[in-house]
Swiss-Prot record:
Transmembrane segments: 47-69, 79-98
GO cellular component: endoplasmic reticulum; signal peptidase complex
Function statement: Component of the signal peptidase complex (SPC) which catalyzes the cleavage of N-terminal signal sequences from nascent proteins as they are translocated into the lumen of the endoplasmic reticulum. Enhances the enzymatic activity of SPC and facilitates the interactions between different components of the translocation site.
Name listed for the protein in its UniProt record: Signal peptidase complex subunit 2
Lumenal side: 70-78
Family according to the record: Belongs to the SPCS2 family.
Domain of life: Eukaryota
Pfam family, one: SPC25
Compartments (UniProt record): Endoplasmic reticulum membrane
Keywords, alphabetical: Endoplasmic reticulum, Membrane, Transmembrane, Transmembrane helix
Record-level GO BP terms: signal peptide processing
Membrane topology: Multi-pass membrane protein
Coiled coil spans: none
Length: 192
């Protein structure tokens, strides 16, 4: 009985390679997503779906160009059109990544039943050769009347991981929830 408890506890442990900052960032980002969604915010996957659709169209264009019935000299104009379309669609995809996504790890809808808040854009940064993890919460609709001010948390990742690379979820959870609460307090209050 005791062994089963230990096994189930070990399965839920999030462990990172402390020498790999990508591994650390991935575990922290995954935990942030879990925390935010547990607070009643549902994930908005529209941007991800748009990127997938664009990527699929790009692949279809490349496949059509590759396996078109006619051989090269005869299909020259068609190939030029496919190449141009491929470049344009990739440029659109990169533009979306650069302007909309940036460092975002999670887009959310407003909490259900809430008429006074917008969804969230949660973004994070862990620069190379640095231990400073920056977590930012912004409004998904910054032009909205009910958009809150951006809040930010910057801390050393060494405060959340043991020397074995295990994430101390309680400490991290507390810091992220405090940031979410801080954002909720920053939201503009309705005038009566």
């Amino acid at each position: 009985m005791e062994e089963k408890k230990t096994e189930s506890t070990n399965k839920n442990v999030k462990k990172a390679n402390l020498l790999d900052h990508h591994s650390i960032k991935h575990i922290l980002d995954e935990s942030v997503s879990d925390i935010v969604t547990s607070r009643g915010y549902k994930e908005d996957v529209r941007l991800s779906n748009l990127k997938l659709i664009l990527g699929t169209i790009i692949i279809v264009v490349a496949l059509v160009a590759q396996f078109y019935n006619k051989k090269f000299p005869e299909n020259r104009d068609f190939l030029i059109g496919c190449i141009a379309l491929y470049v344009v669609l990739n440029a659109v995809l990169q533009l979306i990544l650069y302007t909309k996504e940036k460092n975002a790890i999670l887009f959310t809808y407003p909490p259900e039943g809430s008429f006074t808040s917008t969804g969230l854009v949660v973004s994070s940064k862990l620069p190379r050769f640095s231990d400073q993890y920056t977590l930012t919460i912004d409004s998904a609709d910054p032009k909205s009347i009910s958009a809150g001010k951006s809040v930010q948390l910057t801390k050393s990742v060494t405060q959340w991981f043991t020397k074995d690379g295990v994430l101390v979820e309680g400490l991290f959870w507390k810091d992220v929830e405090a940031l979410i609460k801080n954002y909720a307090e920053e939201e503009p209050k309705k005038k009566k």
